[in-house]
Regions:
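Helix-loop-helix hairpin linking two adjacent transmembrane segments in secondary transporters
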Residues: 103, 143, 147-198
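Central cavity-lining transmembrane alpha-helices of secondary-active solute carriers
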Residues: 54-72
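Cytoplasmic helix-loop-helix junction between adjacent transmembrane helices
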Residues: 112-149
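Juxtamembrane intracellular "pre-TM" segments in multi-pass secondary transporters
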Residues: 1-14, 199-223
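Extracytoplasmic
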Residues: 15-43, 47, 127-128, 237-242
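Extracytoplasmic gate region of multi-pass secondary transporters
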Residues: 34-38, 216-252
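C-terminal ends and interior cores of transmembrane alpha-helices
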Residues: 88-103
Length: 252
């Protein structure tokens, strides 16, 4: 009989997996729409390209500052509460675009994006390993790959939807308000349902032995450097590609 990737020890984790996987799409969407904000803010607030890069600096700066606190939250309260914390911060930051559109302050939008970045940090740190325990351990790779595919779709849909809305005169608060309502609704759902504790599964797999000094592992150090360079290249290209397309290739 073919083994289900969502069933384990008599439990079916399909619904929780679908809920968690939807979050992969949402943070991909959040990153995708971020790239559209640069030219939008340049036009709306008459700021330079360099100044508009504060949008990326706010989000990815939050990743740098919030990474260790996110790990502390997970260690103390578990992955489930880490996901919920990330969703709440993500939702609050998104809803902050509503007063931001009234105040019409670029720096308030930057603050909103920083809060969103803090939420995304908690969310990504928690949700990635969460998918690995929502079913049979032997199928963990299949589940996380499936979830990550939705993240890629979010990256594609984000700029398409964002560009269509923002450059057609729609209030910038509308797409973010809808995202905020959705993620806060998911946070409420997750707070009401029972899910497994990934920490217990991890401790069982490692016999309670956890590497306390990962920086001493060369593979970890090189992996971290690779991620740093990859994100730097990706962000640098994505942030100003629309400007490049308009000014150099004359695409409108």
């Amino acid at each position: 009989m073919k083994q289900s990737i969502f069933r384990y020890e008599g439990h079916n984790y399909l619904v929780p997996f679908l809920i968690i996987s939807s979050l992969f799409f949402m943070w991909g969407f959040a990153h995708g729409i971020l790239e559209v904000l640069n030219p939008h803010f340049q036009e709306s607030f008459h700021i330079s390209k360099t100044m508009s890069a504060l949008t990326q600096a706010a989000v990815y700066g939050a990743y740098f500052l919030m990474a260790l606190p996110a790990g502390w939250i997970i260690k103390k309260w578990g992955y489930r509460r880490g996901v919920i914390t990330g969703l709440v911060l993500f939702g609050i930051g998104s809803l902050m675009f509503i007063p931001g559109s009234k105040i019409n302050s670029f720096y308030f939008f930057v603050l909103s994006l920083f809060v969103i970045g803090c939420g995304l940090t908690c969310l990504e740190t928690s949700a990635n390993p969460y998918t690995t325990v929502l079913g049979h351990p032997d199928k963990a790779e299949s589940r996380i790959n499936l979830s990550q595919s939705l993240n890629g779709i979010g990256w594609i849909v984000g700029p398409l939807v964002g560009g269509q809305l923002l450059f057609s005169g729609v209030n910038i608060a509308i797409p973010y308000a809808l995202v905020g309502i959705f993620v806060l609704s998911v946070a409420l759902i997750l707070s009401r349902i029972t899910l497994p504790d990934p920490r217990r599964a991890h401790e069982a797999d490692t016999n309670g032995k956890i590497e306390e000094k990962p920086m001493h592992a060369m593979a970890f150090s090189f992996g971290m450097l690779t991620l740093f360079l990859y994100v730097a290249a990706q962000t640098g290209v994505n942030s100003f590609f629309i400007n490049y397309a308009e000014e150099s290739i004359h695409i409108e």
